[in-house]
Amino acid sequence: MKVTAAFAGLLVTAFAPPVPEPVLVSRSAGINYVQNYNGNLGDFTYDESAGTFSMYWEDGVSSDFVVGLGWTTGSSNAITYSAEYSASGSSSYLAVYGWVNLSQAEYYIVEDYGDYNPCSSATSLGTEYSDGSTYQVCTDTRTNEPSITGTSTFTQYFSVRESTRTSGTVTVAIHFNFWAQHGFGNSDFNYQVMAVEAWSGACSASVTISS
């Protein structure tokens, strides 16, 4: 989730099967999905037609929650957003978040975060540059954990922005293409949202998705 002498490397390059080109799926619908996983742990409100949501939670959150707005079927389309996100002292993310059906994977493009960087404890895949910043890229395997199909074992992919921000355009295709070199299935998408996730601390977020 890893290179030999130069000559051996040349042989591997010469005889390895080509990496298939990723299939990039475009989004055809406006916002049509509300993500509300344990939103009752805080004050989650949203206006689907306006593309806005907010979440406030107090210190003492007892479990993980993920809330946001997006699309029932994900895509490689760019996502433009603006947010007011106060993450200090919380374990939380502001991220593009979604799932792939086969092979099952959970993914995050983390634009800002609180006191925990998920790549600090995962397997590094290197770095990539997108939208004015370097992103750390990493992967992890979750075993017998909650998923879109109940309890299952699946792969997680993370791109974590080094120059964090709370507004801008996320060129999703760059991240999908990078992950596809490491096993990410780039076509059979489940839902995709601009999300806030947290599991400790106190924080507030107000997010607008414009595309």
Curated annotation (Swiss-Prot):
Please give the UniProt note on temperature dependence for this protein. Answer: Optimum temperature is 60 degrees Celsius.
Q: Which Pfam families match?
A: Glyco_hydro_11
Indicate where this protein is primarily found: secreted
Q: In which pathway does it act?
A: Glycan degradation; xylan degradation
Ranges for domain GH11 come to 19-210
Using the record, list the residue span of the signal peptide; answer none if the entry has no such feature: 1-16
The GO terms this record gives for MF are:
endo-1,4-beta-xylanase activity
Could you tell me what reaction this enzyme catalyses?
Answer: Endohydrolysis of (1->4)-beta-D-xylosidic linkages in xylans
- Report the pH profile: Optimum pH is 4.0.
- Recorded GO CC terms: extracellular region
Gene3D superfamilies in alphabetical order: 2.60.120.180
Q: Would the keyword Signal turn up in this protein's UniProt record?
A: yes
Where does it live in the cell? Answer: Secreted
User: By its UniProt entry, which PANTHER family does this protein fall under?
Assistant: ENDO-1,4-BETA-XYLANASE A-RELATED (PTHR46828:SF2)
Instruction: Give the family from UniProt.
Output: Belongs to the glycosyl hydrolase 11 (cellulase G) family.
What is the official name of this protein in its record?
A: Endo-1,4-beta-xylanase 4
